[in-house]
């Protein structure tokens, strides 16, 4: 699947230097520089991170100027490269999740990003700690009241154009706009001002995966120098700002950041993705029967896509007289006519799309047309926290929970959260006792065991016993270890 953002950009001949050769520091020099960077981060009182496309390449999203970058291939007449995953299923990288941990510990004060992939927000970085200079392919904004809408699908347009949706505020209702800049669009003042202020305050601006060529954004990190701050750059190519930097590291960003986190004795949290679905059931009485309609839709609107769902299976375990069905086309809808006096249970099985960490998840839905269900709204942040804790503890996706329900005569609607992916980056308890060379491959990439997507199906019982035995010998608790 090609990247919609790159295809939607208007054509521009001059995109700066592309296809620049990649530079790799020797293992010895890289190790030394990582140690130096770890000291700089540890001693920083106001760390600001400035990110570019290079921090997302390990998630399957191509960069722009590298040997296989978007603009490099376009200049050679090869067109836009394909992504290894659908854009909406791209997973935050080790670097994204490390930044989340650095922010939680209070070390990282702010992130300035030139990326539009939404991976910083998807990783869990607080919105107030992020400036997205070039916009976000998954975000809409109301030009009237400035309310932002983060979607689970890619917005159809770029260039600050109108989208098909409107502001949900009852006092507003204005047509929403996309937030992604085209070539001639000016940087959003709110994001720009916040980024400038943070760079001026920073005692260290760490530039990750950016060639620092796009103006005016590329000049922001240097604002820290005026107040005695420092700049560090981690990138595979040389940048125009290298001479101004206190430290320049040529290496894979994930590898460098993994080393920094290791030396600072900080964990890299797993990425746990939660998606949302709305289920509604409406009915009308027809003599002694009830005609009912089931709908499975997006929380972003009846016409909005559900990109994480491939199909929905509807079955009736306690009613062999009711035929099961597989809904394959969105919007997912089922109409039936049944007896009013016979309650039943619907089993809804959500079959997930490619890129999810498990194949499916099922929800039981009791139906009794003679009783009206109660309405409630649960604490969303608490429910999501519990869901994520359960997913991390079990090392698998597929958990679900109801967030809210509205019951009215002849209808009920509920919103459910589903854990659709879990990815671990830092799970080896014995790593601290192992030299760095053994957990970093000689080719410059992280060992596979530090980037492991966990599916829904648990490991075999034989493998679980072997792992548990090994952990007991090491004095570890098998229940908390990844299989």
UniProtKB/Swiss-Prot annotation:
Keywords from UniProt, A to Z, are: Metal-binding, NAD, Nucleus, Transferase, Zinc
Disulfide bonds listed in the record: none
Which of this chain's residues are annotated to bind Zn(2+)?
Answer: 142, 145, 167, 172
Q: Which reaction does it catalyse?
A: N(6)-acetyl-L-lysyl-[protein] + NAD(+) + H2O = 2''-O-acetyl-ADP-D-ribose + nicotinamide + L-lysyl-[protein]
In the UniProt record, the signal sequence range is none
- Localization terms from the record: Nucleus
GO process annotations (BP): negative regulation of transcription by RNA polymerase II
Q: What does this protein do?
A: NAD-dependent protein deacetylase. Has deacetylase activity towards H3K9Ac. May have a function in the safeguard against genome instability and DNA damage to ensure plant cell growth. May negatively regulate metabolic signal transduction involving methanol and jasmonates during leaf senescence. Required for histone H3K9Ac deacetylation and repression of AP2-1/RSR1 and amylase genes during early seed development. Functions as an epigenetic regulator to repress the expression of glycolytic genes and glycolysis in seedlings.
Member of which family?
A: Belongs to the sirtuin family. Class IV subfamily.
Kindly provide the name given to this protein in its UniProt entry.
NAD-dependent protein deacetylase SRT1
Write the lineage as a comma-separated list.
Eukaryota, Viridiplantae, Streptophyta, Embryophyta, Tracheophyta
Gene that encodes it = SRT1
